[in-house]
């Protein structure tokens, strides 16, 4: 859990504490469930880079060849924003033990 603290800190700092974010994170629930199902089939090794975030990650068709020789696992969904990612971070990351996590949201 200590490994997730820096990621969560960055995510929380990136979000304005004064702004009211809409509670629309549930709209990605089906996408997240599909990614959890994929996690049962494709695990991230200790030296992999886990890419999480919006559809830019999901639609990056050549991510494995573009990031070669690194092992990568892409977990992109919908049109994610930081407040969505905060909501789903544990579910997207908990089954992996990556060397690094790359985050991209619009």
Q: For each predicted feature, which ranges?
A:
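Phenylalanine-focused residue identity feature
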Residues: 4-5, 51, 82-83, 104
